[in-house]
């Protein structure tokens, strides 16, 4: 599966989204993943991307979704944010993990907003739900633990049930209609690449269903429109070599292609990373 995606990039050039006629500044808007407030250490809060964007003189903001909100609740927050931001900025939306589910529902509600995006970058996006949710909901002996966890974080059961596998099909249907470039960055790990015991456990549970990153089934990427950049040996949080924030920063610099606005962007970028195939080979 990795070879399939990597080979598709071999002759694809990286197109620029920069429009000289559009004077609006660039804004990187981050849709965070689940538990981003409770467990910021996993990277789902986008903090590192915000810090790196500041170094590149880009505006970068985290959309204040609910850490354990349902996709519908968070979709409304995303659309409210975009309605305002798009009036003043060219927006690149970066969705992290479950943030992709939230953004997919947001697009289904307001496709007109997403057609105005400069680009959409999904990092380890959960686009079709996750078998994690099925496991937690269907195992009777886990129900008390799940209930306690939800109570502790002030969330309801719908926050988990809405993430059942195949429950987020809106993502595929909606993104088929977008005119904005969509890029999916996804880790392709083997068991030996996973340093976290919990990640190895989930990886083993899901492997009978096919290749996975310990959260999502990687064959689901075949359903999504846009460009898939596979990262060999990286887990769901893209921990391998350069981290997710560095990869996304490099990608945004290539997509924007506006060296006149900020020469340091390309001065700090490896010039060999100007095609999709070279990007995936190096990360």
Language-model segment annotations:
Residues 177-283:
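C-terminal catalytic-base region of ester-bond hydrolases, centering on the histidine
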Residues 29, 61, 119-121, 183-186, ...:
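Hydrophobic/aromatic beta-strand patches that form the interior of the parallel beta-sheet core
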Residues 42, 130-136, 193-199:
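Short aromatic-enriched loop/helix-cap "lid" or pocket-rim segments at secondary-structure transitions
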Residues 19-91, 146-150:
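Active-site catalytic motif of lipid deacylating hydrolases and related acyltransferases
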Residues 31-34, 96-97, 125, 187:
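Glycine-rich His-Gly loop
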Residues 6-19:
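A short, compositionally biased domain-edge/stem linker segment
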Residues 1-4:
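Helix-enriched interaction subdomains in cytosolic or periplasmic regions
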Residues 76-175:
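Serine-dependent carboxylesterase/thioesterase catalytic core
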